[in-house]
Amino acid sequence: MFIDSHYHFMAGMNEKAAAGMVGMIVHEARKMGMNPDYETMLKIAVQTWGDPLGDRLIDKMDEGGIDVTVAVNVDDFNIKQLTWEKMQAQNRILGEAVQRHPGRIISLAGIDPRRPEAADMTRVCLEEYGLRGIKYHPDHGFDPGGPESYKVLEVLAKNKGILLCHTSPLMPKGRCKFADPMLLADIAVDFPEIKVIAAHMGGYINWRPWASLAAFQSTMYGDTAVWDTLAFKNYKLFCRELREAIDLAGPTKILFGSDAPIQTLLYPMKTMVQFIQDLPKKAPADIHFTEEEVELILGGNARSVLGLADAFSNA
């Protein structure tokens, strides 16, 4: 079973909303030696990212060989026109997409803890909409281990929910100091019920702080989202960094994540999966991966974190 633990659900999309994300992807692509056309990518994003029913997601999952996807919303209190009511409507739509495609989608609500309504939004999402946890983007300007966040995490802990939290530097306007994995350190102490997935593992340049936590905290995990850009540009370096991350954090701590449909503007899901599948055969001669490690990354670890092991024990 293959599980994508990091997919961005978007109920709708317009050119203004897509522009920043496409700009980020173009920046990544140029670092990889690609020469993408911004206008073409923007057009594709506007035409294909909006997916209120989740039908496009399911089609892409089937095309890429993905059995289950963790679909997330993203909230940003800085966007004044994005009121809490509008954000909560997006979370409700995500919950409805899950019901439309039973067994295929696991959903995480977009919550910005700076909202006065954030804790109650979280409660409704978990207890009424059927979502399984929340997604944080602290690079929007908040401390994921701060007092505002803790009010939300209290609700999350009560419901034994999952926290997927962005950790990795971004281009401006991202406030990178808030995306440091070490800001998540106290959550394991104060909320041991919460399983934390550090999106990007802090990034393929700065993953060691994440690994230092994951090695000692049983509830700390990370995903591989955007690590595929390193694999594309320098597969040997990708293999070396991932090997060290596994050795230091442990083989059960890393989950496959795509960051689709944003990242799949560059190449299809199958390519991302293949980067991982090829590790035992295509890694440099002095770097070794086992088939068991590949199976854990592509699905086994996520099954455990998401509580799917029993439900899919016969899959």
Question: Where would I find each of the regions flagged by the language model?
Answer:
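Short helix-capping segments at alpha-helix termini
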Residues: 99-104, 190-194, 216-219, 249, ...
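Active-site gating/metal-coordination segments in enzymes
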Residues: 67-179, 228-229
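Mid-to-C-terminal alpha-helical segments outside catalytic/metal-binding sites
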Residues: 1-3, 14-63, 68, 123-124, ...
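Short aromatic-enriched loop/helix-cap "lid" or pocket-rim segments at secondary-structure transitions
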Residues: 13-19, 82-83, 120-122, 176-177, ...
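Generic structural signal for well-ordered alpha-helices
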Residues: 55-58, 91-98, 122-123, 149, ...
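Divalent metal-coordination and catalytic microenvironments
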Residues: 6, 61, 69, 94, ...
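Catalytic pocket-lining loop regions of alpha/beta-barrel enzymes
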Residues: 128-133, 141-256
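Active-site environment of divalent metal-dependent phosphoester hydrolases
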Residues: 10-13, 76-79, 113-117, 169-173, ...
